[in-house]
Amino acid sequence: MPEPHAPWNEVVPGLWMGGHHWTDASGERRPVIVGTEFGLVISLYTRPGHGPDPSVDHLVAEIPDGPLVAAQIHSVQQLAHTAARSVKEGRTVLVRCNAGYNRSGLVIAQTLIELGHEAPTAIHTVRQRRSPSALNNRLFEEYLNAGLGVAHLLADLETLS
């Protein structure tokens, strides 16, 4: 999978998607270090030295790039709700994970759904604005198409069996 060609991309006004590394025009891999560019940073993966600045609101909820349990799906729902509310309030929001494709794509797409988009449109928008490689985790796409509420209930049922 190719590295992103930008540290972050604006998906809709005020809502940005990124990762922890990107490849510049010369092909050199560079770290993404967030300073004070955003009012809120949501990290689904963290590494020391990648920011954001201590003055920036920073929410961390590390989730795997694979099947999620009910509590993790609930975290995605809450983070997306917070991101949508922040965008509506005029704040700039960055959602990031390791590569800036799957976990951040899941939260960004759910944020778009919270902002009134249909799931297929949200998925398409993420891929168009970040990369065709975004949301290549088909399970995350299935969660979005089914609805995270349904995915949460089904994941919760699996823990009972």
Model features per residue range: what roles?
Residues 106, 145-148:
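Short linear sequence elements within intrinsically disordered, low-complexity coil regions
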Residues 90-109, 113:
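A phosphate-binding catalytic loop at a beta-strand-loop-alpha-helix junction
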Residues 149-161:
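C-terminal domain-closing interface element
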Residues 12, 109, 151-154:
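Generic N-terminal initiation segments characterized by hydrophobic and/or small/turn-forming residues
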Residues 2-92, 113-146:
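Cysteine-based protein phosphatase catalytic domain of the PTP/DSP
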